[in-house]
From Swiss-Prot:
This is Ribosome-recycling factor. GO terms for molecular function: ribosomal large subunit binding. It comes from Rickettsia akari (strain Hartford). The keyword Zinc does not apply. Keywords: Cytoplasm, Protein biosynthesis. One of its GO terms (cellular component) is cytosol. It is found in: Cytoplasm.
Length: 186
């Protein structure tokens, strides 16, 4: 493996770690309604588990409500059950094929719990970044040992890997800071 390929692979892995963090943070509830809250909700449909977005359309008519328009009338009770089982703290109100999910205001205590959870997700992402950095540095050692790169080039590339790690680590920090602001805004 050459050094350019290695850098590209490390960057792709770090991008993936950042995307995972972004997905986890979208699942955290802020005070506003967001269809992203329902991304992980699965529904028993047609004999298998399906994502809610595959059996209904989701919308936010206002800042405190999510509407779930179920396409198949026979699925309404399964969708209600899926939302309840997801344990999001939302109570479905059904009106025909339309399910309204009023978003209750977050208590101060719940906000603090969500901030802690966001920080945990951030720390998990940083651990992933450090593991990726370690793998990259091990690969560089192997390249040096096999006389593919010189010792000084190994040192320079290690510094580049560290810079890349620092860059992505600061992206994680800013994502967490932004989410914390969103959660704590009343």
């Amino acid at each position: 493996m050459d050094t350019e390929t290695l850098k590209k692979i490390l960057q792709e892995k770090m991008d993936k770690a950042l995307k995972v963090l972004d997905h986890e943070l979208k699942g955290l509830r802020t005070g506003r309604a967001s269809v992203n809250l329902l991304d992980s909700v699965t529904v028993e449909a047609y004999g298998s588990k399906m994502l809610l977005s595959q059996v209904a359309s989701l919308s936010t008519p206002d800042a405190r409500t999510i509407n779930v328009q179920v396409w198949d009338k026979s699925m309404v009770s399964s969708v209600e059950k899926g939302i309840t089982i997801a344990n999001l703290g939302l109570t479905p109100a059904t009106d025909g094929q339309l399910i309204r999910l009023p978003i209750p205001a977050l208590t101060e205590e719940r906000r603090k719990e969500l901030v802690k959870l966001a920080h945990k997700y951030g720390e998990d992402a940083k651990i992933s970044l450090r593991n990726i950095r370690r793998d990259g540095n091990e690969e560089l050692k192997k390249l040096e040992k096999d006389n593919i790169i010189a010792k000084d080039e190994h040192h320079n590339l290690s510094e580049q890997v560290q810079k890349l790690t620092d860059e992505y680590s600061s992206k994680v920090d800013s994502a967490i800071k932004q989410k914390e602001q969103d959660i704590m805004t009343v």
